Structure formats: C-alpha cells, structure tokens
Design a protein with these regions (language model features):
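Conserved lysine of the Walker
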Residues: 15
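NTP-dependent small-molecule kinase module
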Residues: 23, 130-194
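A glycine- and Lys/Arg-enriched "phosphate-lid" helix/loop adjacent to the NTP-binding pocket
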Residues: 97-100, 104-157
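Walker A (P-loop) phosphate-binding loop of P-loop NTPases
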Residues: 12
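Post-Walker A helix-loop "phosphate-sensing" segment adjacent to the P-loop in P-loop NTPases
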Residues: 24-33
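Hydrophobic anchor at the beta1->P-loop junction of P-loop NTPases
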Residues: 7
Length: 194
C-alpha cells in the first residue's frame, strides 16, 4: 500500500463527497484507488453494524460498535497490508469510538490509535451539529440511532479529545473549498515521498 487516506466526522459532514473527489484526483494520475466506506455492505460485520445502527437501545449501540470495529479491522487486514493496494481511502475509521460512553471512549481510542495504521492524510471533517442534521434530513434515508441534534452535539464534543493526530478541516464550507484543502495536504504529503 502506497497511500492511505482517511475521512471521518459526524454524519452529513461530506465524507463520501470528499472521498470521491480525492479518489478522482488520484485516478486522473493513473493510480489505482480502493475505497472502503464503513460500515461496508460487502461483509457480515458491516451489514450487522448497519442493521444495529437502524435500531435503538444500548444493546444495539454495543452491537453496532462491535461489528463496526470488526468491519474496519477486516478492511485494514485485506487492503492496508495488501502489497497490490496503491491508494486506499477509508470513509469512517477510528472516530467511531466517540459514540462509546465517556471514559471508555478515551481508553478505547488510545488503544485503537496505537494498534491501527495512521497516516498524515487523516481528515476530520468538522461540521456543526446543526449543519450535520440539516444534511442528514435532506437525504431522505432511514434515520440511524445517533442522527439527532442532541447526540450529534455530544459526539462532536467527544471527538475533540481524539482528533489531535488528524487534519481538522472545517466542513460547513462548500465541497469544492473543503476538497481544495484536502488536496493541498495530500499533494504536500506525496511530495515528501519523492
């Protein structure tokens, strides 16, 4: 694997949009790009995580988190450590720990961030909870358990303790503005490798 890029942030922050824009940039350079958007629908862990996210209650919260973690680990194992992978882009990664209860989330993040691969191209798209909710509601999709203003505010607050290793990009801006900031950081990172 030659290039590892990660996007994370609240639902509705524009992760998938930015994944597609940066993938397009690398594909135009003739690079092979693999995209993993967690939870992934191509394996049982991702599907079970998504099913639990569409339900409510503490048990489903725990199930969603556990299966999400297994889904992400599967992607790391199958793609990050694959010598045939050129550019690997993840939509959602370690910030899922922000959904865990206080104190537990800090401990789990420290463990996860020391075990899983990192990159200088990890982007936290920092959208306001209000803008996040507006974007979520405009999608006309089934609502997940954390897609309400109260939970979005809590989760955004919790992410502040874990984004110290990330490039924090304000995400209330237009997609093109965000994309240019992301591209500038990725290009600078690529130049270090030359």
């Amino acid at each position: 694997m030659n290039k590892f890029i990660v996007f994370d942030g609240l639902d509705g922050c524009g992760k998938d949009t930015q994944v597609n824009l940066i993938a397009e940039m690398y594909e135009q350079q003739g690079r092979k790009v693999d995209i993993r958007s967690h939870p992934c629908s191509d394996n049982k862990f991702g599907r079970k995580s998504k099913q639990a996210l569409l339900k409510t209650g503490k048990f489903n919260h725990l199930k969603a988190t556990l299966y999400y973690g297994l889904d992400a680990l599967r992607s790391v194992h199958m793609y990050y450590y694959n010598k045939d992978t050129d550019v690997l882009i993840f939509s959602r990664y370690t910030m899922a720990v922000a959904y865990l209860p206080d104190v537990v989330n800090v401990i789990v993040y420290k463990i996860v961030s020391n075990v899983l691969p990192k990159s200088d191209c990890m982007f936290f798209l920092d959208v306001s909870p209000e803008e996040s909710l507006r974007r979520i509601q405009s999608r006309n999709e089934e609502e997940e358990m954390f897609e309400n203003l109260e939970d979005l505010r809590k989760v955004r607050s919790k992410t502040k303790i874990a984004t110290y290793e990330w490039n924090i990009i304000p995400a209330d801006d237009a997609p093109e503005v965000i994309s240019q900031k992301v591209k500038d950081i990725c290009i600078k990172s690529d130049q270090k490798l030359l």
